[in-house]
């Protein structure tokens, strides 16, 4: 038998990349050789290459829901990306392709279909993103995180697996996390995560509320690339990062409370780590509303407190954080009783079942 090979894809934001990494150790254990296809300048490249995974670059256009002159040129980039992906896949001859979505995945999935290579996609949110909606007809199966998602995946292709969570997240050290942030551990640690690309409204609101929050909490703020406020860099008890990767398990372990966007990967990691959290989902003005649905599901199950972006003010933020701390045991109890499991094993089973065998 030839060595098993899998090509992975997904990008545009960390949420379309890091879940792939959760699968890597188990895939290697099963004997898979792993390669990745992404864009030259995408966030996926820096994340994947740090893991010493072979990276292949293609062209791809962004999928926009708004009017932009690039909407006329980007389809040609996608077409170029399809031809580039076909060339790569014919050369690499993988047994299967795994897609985590994002605009870079579209040409890869279409190319795999043309090359008659099985494709397994994963959808994190309740409703499929635009890239996955385009890709579903070319997929063999689509792994879903939420039970509600199955109704939104056409062709009876959906399989409920849960979301893959990186094993290293469970191996963080609180002491190391405090050291990384320069905190003493005397105050509760409040962690703010605005997504890998950052959130201006969350960043601005947190900083406007700093004078009140910092009296009660040590604050670690992951604010997105280019969003560090140098004027606040020496403020005691307030540590800023544009993005963290290897340090994340330690910093998350040190966190007592978390403010986060409501992307599915992020919230399921918070659930797995049993972190009391305040979710601020992207508004419908700047998204398809998927984060609002995710947040509503978690709020309904008692895992999260939710504030809508349109309602967010510094005063309300402070009130909600204080309330979250006072009710933290209630949220931990709900999370501890959750039936949701790490999706790694389930997804690996799907990949192994549908891989193309070669003699």
Swiss-Prot record:
Location of the protein in the cell: Cell membrane
InterPro entries cross-referenced by the UniProt entry: GlcNAc_MurG, Glyco_trans_28_C, GlycoTrans_28_N
Biological process annotations from GO: carbohydrate metabolic process; cell division; cell wall organization; lipid glycosylation; peptidoglycan biosynthetic process; regulation of cell shape
UniProt keyword annotations, A-Z: Cell cycle, Cell division, Cell membrane, Cell shape, Cell wall biogenesis/degradation, Glycosyltransferase, Membrane, Peptidoglycan synthesis, Transferase
GO cellular component: plasma membrane
Catalytic activity annotation: di-trans,octa-cis-undecaprenyl diphospho-N-acetyl-alpha-D-muramoyl-L-alanyl-D-glutamyl-meso-2,6-diaminopimeloyl-D-alanyl-D-alanine + UDP-N-acetyl-alpha-D-glucosamine = di-trans,octa-cis-undecaprenyl diphospho-[N-acetyl-alpha-D-glucosaminyl-(1->4)]-N-acetyl-alpha-D-muramoyl-L-alanyl-D-glutamyl-meso-2,6-diaminopimeloyl-D-alanyl-D-alanine + UDP + H(+)
Major location category of this protein: membrane
EC numbers for this chain: 2.4.1.227
Pathway(s) of this molecule: Cell wall biogenesis; peptidoglycan biosynthesis
Molecular function per GO: UDP-N-acetyl-D-glucosamine:N-acetylmuramoyl-L-alanyl-D-glutamyl-meso-2,6-diaminopimelyl-D-alanyl-D-alanine-diphosphoundecaprenol 4-beta-N-acetylglucosaminlytransferase activity; undecaprenyldiphospho-muramoylpentapeptide beta-N-acetylglucosaminyltransferase activity
Xref: HAMAP family: MurG
Cited NCBIfam families: murG, PRK12446.1
Protein name per Swiss-Prot or TrEMBL: UDP-N-acetylglucosamine--N-acetylmuramyl-(pentapeptide) pyrophosphoryl-undecaprenol N-acetylglucosamine transferase
Organism: Clostridium acetobutylicum (strain ATCC 824 / DSM 792 / JCM 1419 / IAM 19013 / LMG 5710 / NBRC 13948 / NRRL B-527 / VKM B-1787 / 2291 / W)
């Amino acid at each position: 038998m030839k060595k098993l090979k899998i090509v992975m894809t997904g990008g545009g934001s960390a949420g379309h990349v890091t879940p792939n990494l959760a699968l890597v150790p188990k895939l290697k254990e099963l004997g898979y050789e792993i390669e990745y296809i992404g864009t030259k300048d995408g966030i996926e490249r820096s994340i994947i290459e740090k893991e010493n995974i072979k990276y292949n670059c293609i062209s791809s256009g962004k999928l926009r829901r708004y009017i932009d002159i690039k909407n006329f040129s980007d389809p040609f980039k996608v077409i170029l990306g399809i031809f580039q992906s076909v060339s790569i896949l014919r050369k690499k001859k993988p047994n299967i392709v795994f897609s985590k979505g994002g605009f870079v995945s579209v040409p890869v999935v279409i190319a795999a279909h043309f090359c008659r290579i099985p494709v397994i996609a994963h959808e994190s949110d309740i409703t499929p993103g635009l890239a996955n909606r385009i890709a579903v007809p070319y997929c063999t199966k689509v792994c879903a995180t939420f039970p509600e998602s199955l109704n939104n995946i056409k062709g009876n292709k959906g399989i409920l697996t849960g979301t893959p969570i990186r094993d290293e997240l469970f191996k963080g050290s609180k002491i190391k996390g405090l050291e990384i942030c320069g905190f003493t551990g005397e105050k509760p640690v409040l962690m703010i995560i605005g997504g890998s690309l950052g959130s201006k409204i969350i960043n601005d609101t947190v900083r406007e509320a700093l004078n009140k929050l910092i009296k009660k909490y040590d604050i670690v703020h992951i604010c997105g690339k280019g969003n560090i406020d140098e004027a606040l860099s020496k403020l005691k008890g307030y540590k800023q990062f544009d993005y963290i990767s290897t340090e994340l398990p330690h910093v998350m372990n040190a966190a007592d409370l978390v403010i986060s966007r409501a992307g599915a990967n992020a919230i399921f990691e918070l659930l797995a780590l049993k972190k009391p959290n305040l979710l601020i989902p992207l508004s419908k003005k700047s998204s398809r509303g998927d984060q609002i649905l995710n947040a509503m599901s978690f709020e309904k199950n008692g895992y999260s407190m939710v504030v809508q972006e349109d309602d967010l003010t510094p005063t309300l933020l402070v009130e909600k954080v204080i309330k979250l701390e006072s009710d933290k045991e209630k949220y931990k109890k709900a999370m501890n009783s959750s039936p949701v499991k790490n999706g790694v094993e389930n997804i690996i089973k799907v990949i192994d079942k549908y891989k193309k065998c070669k003699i």
